[in-house]
Amino acid sequence: MQFFGRLVNTFSGVTNLFSNPFRVKEVAVADYTSSDRVREEGQLILFQNTPNRTWDCVLVNPRNSQSGFRLFQLELEADALVNFHQYSSQLLPFYESSPQVLHTEVLQHLTDLIRNHPSWSVAHLAVELGIRECFHHSRIISCANCAENEEGCTPLHLACRKGDGEILVELVQYCHTQMDVTDYKGETVFHYAVQGDNSQVLQLLGRNAVAGLNQVNNQGLTPLHLACQLGKQEMVRVLLLCNARCNIMGPNGYPIHSAMKFSQKGCAEMIISMDSSQIHSKDPRYGASPLHWAKNAEMARMLLKRGCNVNSTSSAGNTALHVAVMRNRFDCAIVLLTHGANADARGEHGNTPLHLAMSKDNVEMIKALIVFGAEVDTPNDFGETPTFLASKIGRLVTRKAILTLLRTVGAEYCFPPIHGVPAEQGSAAPHHPFSLERAQPPPISLNNLELQDLMHISRARKPAFILGSMRDEKRTHDHLLCLDGGGVKGLIIIQLLIAIEKASGVATKDLFDWVAGTSTGGILALAILHSKSMAYMRGMYFRMKDEVFRGSRPYESGPLEEFLKREFGEHTKMTDVRKPKVMLTGTLSDRQPAELHLFRNYDAPETVREPRFNQNVNLRPPAQPSDQLVWRAARSSGAAPTYFRPNGRFLDGGLLANNPTLDAMTEIHEYNQDLIRKGQANKVKKLSIVVSLGTGRSPQVPVTCVDVFRPSNPWELAKTVFGAKELGKMVVDCCTDPDGRAVDRARAWCEMVGIQYFRLNPQLGTDIMLDEVSDTVLVNALWETEVYIYEHREEFQKLIQLLLSP
């Protein structure tokens, strides 16, 4: 027993040693009958607790004099007297005005506030305590406009920051507090309310006060600036409803610029929706638009969708693309480029974005700019070309690769002009160990797209084989353009068409009489039909992938359908535009075996051949071209299984004709035969050129096993599963293969009947999925396409000559 007694005493001593001396505890007043009363103020008594050798402060319950609350228990008399004086001057209004104070938890909170904030008035304490009845006490009312010494804030400031609307009403209606006061930082009650979480407080302030709504603090921020900086979207909405001004300058410009600087998309959208002119506002420091301040792709995309000028310039002449390149914001730069940013815009000191990318040693950015049309030999105001800036790159490997790249595009390695020296002499590079010589570049390695591949791309872009002659508008032969399927890899087709247009100087629509497309090729065929530029389509594809390929497969069809409606019109019919003739492939899946269907913008030719199947089954015929909606035709041709759900009874045309060349030639032959049967032989035009564009050839890889059999052990089971997977992939690839024998058959057919056949399809270094969304991967694919164009420049030159000939 003695052992347990000593253990209890020891534990009690340790507990007392580490216990909080200011912990509020409910006690009986009778426990202090033997203690001396050192001080007494109202219901507050300071006892000298002789047995424990402590000084205890007890608040006697005004409603029950037999009980009380010990507020502290201190060992030093001096500390006890200081705290007693502090408590006695602050507690009286609270226990006199509200019985809620007489609870242990409330008293603990209140006494902690008194100690932690010695400069607070009773009104400040009442706000933080949050008991409404206290604000009816005369002493608290008298302190309603007092400012504390820590921040210079009034009780109303605290109520706003706390977000307590009920206390705010008490202060305004019963205490008649002033609402136009500021703290030491110059912040009004609106600034404090913005930092809270209750937008109703802002609404109450807006109804009761106008002063301070648009006032700037010592940092030059209005409440609206601060709300944008903190990302308080609801606060921004309420401030705008209270008529907060959007045109007050802050240190970073208008509130819209603050929202952009801190990437607060919701706040920026709210401001623009309330005042659309803010999207064009310029900040005072740089003269920059909100788009210049965009730090990520999402913010830039939001502004561009709302009509922001993508090529707006700052005071220094820089566009948003200049800023994105300077800050190495690749994703943001891609968004700007795909929305029409001028890749050759001259900014401060005449620098183009490519000049800046060179100085930043950003290879991916350089690729993107060149792919989107940036010129590599443009000098700035100092006569410096991108070549010269590339020579300053610190890393030797990168420097040599980029300099070689620029040399291969025809850029001259020249120094800035020297005063007093003729331009021809001043621009000549002196002989030194690093001078560039015109040497043949090493073979291209498309399997490993690294820096050395940069050196070849611009040669593809250089219009070395541009022909000035225009074709005869009354030519007697037809030209056919065939576009493969391939999802987002349709970008490769677009890049090939851009090269053809650039070399010929003629729009694709005017170069071809027939256009056939499957899936993504079908969308591009319709784009050609409706006179959409290929540069626009390139940007459109980059934008489309982010809208359509969201989540996991199969993707929702809604975004794709809305996209097609937006681009081609919700009510546009196939026959609304009849030149050139366009056909899109689709697969009718409501029958077995499935059949190929062509969506046309002309009447289908009548054939004399016997039906392939006996019509014992009542199958609904497809819609006539005059009734067929364009967007539905595009949706039906691109309904790739496992990627999107079927569009009614239509599946992706790639299942039967991923390379539509032979089907298109068959259609043209049947069309001409129908004209002859109808006595219109004079309208028949012989097909003279067939151009087939692919979406890139994936690299060939070995397959270890396609054996599927009945397994007899776990090892064989695993082997069978793996073989079934590989076999399934092989079957799909064989069904949708646009190359191989499909190309051989088309070429052979054309050679037999004297038709010029061109198959353009670059070899890719990596396998790219139909739903690829990585900007870097897609830019590299376009880069490889440009390299391919350069390597096949003679074939391109021959093609252009034939297309432009009568």
Swiss-Prot record:
Gene3D superfamilies: Ankyrin repeat-containing domain, Cytosolic phospholipase A2 catalytic domain. It comes from the Eukaryota. Its EC number is 3.1.1.4, 3.1.1.5, 3.1.2.2. It catalyses: a 1,2-diacyl-sn-glycero-3-phosphocholine + H2O = a 1-acyl-sn-glycero-3-phosphocholine + a fatty acid + H(+); a 1-O-alkyl-2-acyl-sn-glycero-3-phosphocholine + H2O = a 1-O-alkyl-sn-glycero-3-phosphocholine + a fatty acid + H(+); 1,2-dihexadecanoyl-sn-glycero-3-phosphocholine + H2O = 1-hexadecanoyl-sn-glycero-3-phosphocholine + hexadecanoate + H(+); 1-hexadecanoyl-2-(9Z-octadecenoyl)-sn-glycero-3-phosphocholine + H2O = 1-hexadecanoyl-sn-glycero-3-phosphocholine + (9Z)-octadecenoate + H(+). A motif (DGA/G) lies at residues 652-654. CDD domains: Pat_PNPLA9 (cd07212). InterPro entries: Acyl_Trfase/lysoPLipase (IPR016035), Ankyrin_rpt (IPR002110), Ankyrin_rpt-contain_sf (IPR036770), PLPL9 (IPR047148), PNPLA_dom (IPR002641). Residues 677-686 are annotated as: Calmodulin-binding (1-9-14 motif). The keyword Disulfide bond does not apply. SMART domains: ANK. One of its GO terms (molecular function) is phospholipase A2 activity. The keyword Transmembrane helix applies. Changing R741Q: In PARK14; has no effect on phospholipase, lysophospholipase and thioesterase activities. This is 85/88 kDa calcium-independent phospholipase A2. It comes from Homo sapiens. The gene is PLA2G6.
